[in-house]
A protein has these predicted regions:
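Bacterial Sec-dependent signal peptides at the C-terminal "C-region" and cleavage site
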Residues: 27-35
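C-terminal capping alpha-helices of c-type cytochrome domains
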Residues: 36, 125-162
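Electrostatic cytochrome c docking/interface patches
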Residues: 36-68
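Short pre-active-site segment immediately N-terminal to redox-active cysteine/selenocysteine motifs
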Residues: 68-72, 148
């Protein structure tokens, strides 16, 4: 006769290990620690002022864009990233982004793209309210920090049509 308690204990330990592994994976996917969201003002279809009060770093911004665990940009967008395989085709190519959008327009598209298109599939990278189907690791946390948003904006404004 099997001991039910020991089989249950093994299943519980196994389930706890799986839950712990999934939690570790989710928290390592890029969600930033809770931070106080910095205020911003939307003017028309743009956020004209930097979220941080300073310009971002385009080199760091490029790193965020190509990091599939952090920025997730290349899941939907393609761009001038020859070293990156399997770039997305669902959204506009990022090549020439600053020829199509101003710095402020790019910032709003990153912070809250639903302000421009309520049906967009693009995530709001700097918003924590009015979101649906958000994983536990992402709740009450922006995907990117204000500094990372500014870094991505700084990178995107370097992408001009040739």
């Amino acid at each position: 006769m099997r001991k039910l308690g020991s089989a249950r204990s093994r299943r519980k330990r196994s389930a706890d290990a799986v839950v712990g592994s999934v939690a570790a994976l989710l928290t390592s996917t890029g969600a930033v620690a809770p931070e106080e969201l910095r205020p911003y003002t939307i003017v028309g279809d743009a956020i004209p002022a930097s979220l941080t009060g300073t310009a971002g770093d385009p080199v760091r911004g490029r790193a965020v864009v190509v990091d599939r665990r952090l920025g997730t940009c290349l899941l939907c967008h393609a761009g001038p990233f020859p070293e990156e395989k399997f770039q997305g085709t669902l959204a506009p190519d990022l090549s020439g982004a600053s020829s199509r959008w101003s710095e402020g327009e790019l910032r709003l598209r990153l912070v809250d793209p639903t302000r421009l298109n309520p049906d967009t599939i693009m995530p709001a990278y700097y918003r924590v309210e009015r979101l649906t189907r958000v994983g536990q690791a992402w709740r009450s946390k922006p995907i990117l920090t204000a500094e990372q948003i500014e870094d991505v904006v700084a990178f995107l404004v370097t992408l001009r049509d040739q």
